[in-house]
From Swiss-Prot:
GO cellular component: cytosolic large ribosomal subunit
Gene from which this protein is expressed: rpmB
UniProt keywords, alphabetically: Ribonucleoprotein, Ribosomal protein
Protein name: Large ribosomal subunit protein bL28
Family membership noted in the UniProt record: Belongs to the bacterial ribosomal protein bL28 family.
Family annotation (InterPro entries): Ribosomal_bL28 (IPR026569), Ribosomal_bL28/bL31-like_sf (IPR034704), Ribosomal_bL28_bact-type (IPR001383), Ribosomal_bL28_sf (IPR037147)
GO molecular function, a single term: structural constituent of ribosome
Domain of life: Bacteria
Species name: Psychrobacter sp. (strain PRwf-1)
Listed GO biological process terms: translation
Pfam families linked to this entry: Ribosomal_L28
Keyword set includes Cell membrane: no
Gene3D superfamilies listed in its UniProt record: Ribosomal protein L28/L24
């Protein structure tokens, strides 16, 4: 399972750990992803999505129906 938000498309980024002495070592910044079930009233069923917390806020703002319509328009199976 890839670490990509289905709503926002957020994925891991690469950067550095920087110590007090400014030694740099490579690291990954992972998105805050959650497997979450959303109730879809229009379809009378739950939909399971892998979303970041920002994606959850977008769903709260625009509604699950609009977000699902956008996902289906992109060709994603939900």
């Amino acid at each position: 399972m890839s670490r990509v938000c289905q709503v926002t498309g957020k994925r891991p980024q690469v950067g550095n750990n920087v110590s007090h002495a400014h030694n740099k070592t490579r690291r990954r910044f992972l998105p805050n992803l959650h497997n979450h079930r959303f109730w879809v009233e229009s379809e009378n069923r739950f939909v399971r999505l892998r979303v970041s917390t920002k994606g959850m806020r977008i769903i709260d703002k625009h509604g699950i129906d609009k977000v699902l319509a956008d996902l289906r328009a992109k060709g994603e199976k939900v």
